[in-house]
Amino acid sequence: MSFPADSVGLVTPQKFQFEEPLHLECGRVLPRFELMVETYGTLNADKSNAILICHALSGHHHAAGYHHEDDKKAGWWDSCIGPGKAIDTNKFFVVALNNIGGCSGSTGPTSPNPENDNRPYGPDFPLVTVRDWVKTQAMLSDRLGISVWYAVVGGSLGGMQALQWSVDYPDRLQKCVVIASAPKLSAQNIAFNEVARQSILSDPDFHHGRYLENDSYPKRGLILARMVGHITYLSEEAMKQKFGRDLKSGKFMYGFDVEFQVESYLRYQGEQFSRNFDADTYLIMTKALDYFDPSREYGHSLTEAMSKTKCQFLIVSFTTDWRFAPSRSQEIVDALITNHKPVSYLDIDAEQGHDSFLFPIPLYVKTLRAFLGGEEHLKSTSLEAS
């Protein structure tokens, strides 16, 4: 198979092992952990061109390129990462990882628990937070010899990680890109997550999270959780244009099988997701979303939290995103402006809803490319740093 000219091509994931104990916010300790990582591009001599990509709820380390010659689907953000793309691998060294608690190779619920005869952690895996993830990402940075990231970039839950980076490690990133995100979840968003969790927890095949030990899997619950979540990722206009009230067979069947095209689509999305994602991981990821609030230890003042930051910011929202509405991005912008921090903000007119951040929308791509800059900007930044 020949890959597109602007693709990073074949990539091989790398597993990094960390033998030191990881103390988590929940009070528990992982005795050791592993991170699955992919890199694209070349790290320059002074290591000033590194960009960290933080993934969203269902994301992972495979952000660009292909794993096999016969792969039909590229990485989840291949539209923006590659030679000549917005995140240009001809200029930048790009690092993407699967967070702990995930199910794509990093230590998570399906990993062997050394404290339980190496049986899968399952529900015994500790709840983790965005701050925990950022802590492990900083440890990965040290392992790679990257003292300062040129940029930390993320969409949705990934944007929350980028924001946490700017607060917890203000001297370790020059630029922060927060896309389709929020400074914390609203009550409505927490409610959506709870409905998704309950669909899994109430599945008879869940077995209190020990489904692997019982040779079972809560497929129905995971399908329903994904269906609920997926609705919130799409805008009403996108669903109207894509499906409308189109019938699968062209006529009413007067039954409870699939009749409308949108029903067929949701069931398909749920089915595909259930084959590739772990139920315990889904529970962990949604709780990390719920817990995120960098203002909590600053008297619940986002303005105070943002006063700690030192980097340049790009905040991007999308007009039809009702999961993380533009007003949530504006909260971040307002807190930065109050602190006289350098911030650029763009609310992009896009019909794809929350999922817009995954699409190569021209203005979005142009803005991202312009903010990150190119080789000349890297040279000037390096001179300033020296």
Swiss-Prot record:
Transfers a succinyl group from succinyl-CoA to L-homoserine, forming succinyl-L-homoserine. The keyword Transferase applies. One of its GO terms (molecular function) is homoserine O-acetyltransferase activity. GO terms for biological process: homoserine metabolic process; methionine biosynthetic process. The record marks R323 as: Important for acyl-CoA specificity. It is found in: Cytoplasm. It comes from Acinetobacter baumannii (strain SDF). Substrate binds at R226, D355. This is Homoserine O-succinyltransferase. Homodimer.
